[in-house]
């Protein structure tokens, strides 16, 4: 039986980021070549049905997969200039519509938070975190992080996904330009376990 945590939650985003970096390294041209990352999404299970055979009912783990992809796109924004999510409504989508009713899936919330909070310049960040190893990947940091800075608002946004399915991780946030002495706001997507 497949281990969903290892094969999808950890491996798929790590592989995607590795492929983006490999594409950048293989470009030995004097011109920049950019990537459009098309039709990405969390799609881990398929439910049978009469109408929507490709429909997904997402859980917290899927929302965290979406957040990891958004972190990847911020970290690699020098090369990934466009990233199109596969499907936005109903089939493998963050929103579902049934007649005149709309409901938001778990994968909607990371999209909402990134779209409404991440502005300005993506920051190059350094992460020191406990790590996880799979058969294919060694030393995958449990903390998956991206950050942005909006100079006009003097605002730093830090996006963190804890990949550890069993433990909370305490982290220190340090800045090379001084301490953070302003008000901070936290938006948290969380649950008792990832399969909710």
What residue ranges belong to the model's regions?
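Noncatalytic carbohydrate-binding groove/subsite architecture in carbohydrate-active enzymes
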Residues: 1-69, 127-139
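Conserved, mostly hydrophobic/aromatic
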Residues: 16, 39, 83, 111, ...
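Secondary-structure transition/capping motifs at alpha-helix termini
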Residues: 19-31, 72-81, 117, 178-180
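Generic recognition of flexible, low-complexity loop/linker segments
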Residues: 22-25, 69-72, 82, 133-134, ...
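Generic beta-strand/beta-sheet core signal
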Residues: 36-45, 85-88, 98, 159-163, ...
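Flexible loop/turn segments at secondary-structure boundaries
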Residues: 41-47, 89-95, 133-134, 165-168, ...
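Catalytic cores of secreted or luminal carbohydrate-active enzymes
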Residues: 70-87, 92-141
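Carbohydrate-binding surface patches
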Residues: 140-180, 186
């Amino acid at each position: 039986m497949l281990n969903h945590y290892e094969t999808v939650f950890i491996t798929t985003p790590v592989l995607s980021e590795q492929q983006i970096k490999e594409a950048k390294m293989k470009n030995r041209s004097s011109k920049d070549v950019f990537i459009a990352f098309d039709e990405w999404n969390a799609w881990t299970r398929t439910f049978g049905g009469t109408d929507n055979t490709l429909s997904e009912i997402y859980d917290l783990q899927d929302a965290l997969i979406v957040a990891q992809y958004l972190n990847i796109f911020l970290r690699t924004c020098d090369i990934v200039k466009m990233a199109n999510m596969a499907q936005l409504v109903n089939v493998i989508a963050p929103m579902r519509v049934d007649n005149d009713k709309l409901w938001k899936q778990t994968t909607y919330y990371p999209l909402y938070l990134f779209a409404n909070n991440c502005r300005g310049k993506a920051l190059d960040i350094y992460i020191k975190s406990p790590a996880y190893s799979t058969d294919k990947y060694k030393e995958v940091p449990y903390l998956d992080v991206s950050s942005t800075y909006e100079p006009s608002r003097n605002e730093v946004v830090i996006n963190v996904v804890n990949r550890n399915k069993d433990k909370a991780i305490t982290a220190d946030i340090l800045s090379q330009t001084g301490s953070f002495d302003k008000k901070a706001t936290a938006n948290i997507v969380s649950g008792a376990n990832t399969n909710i």
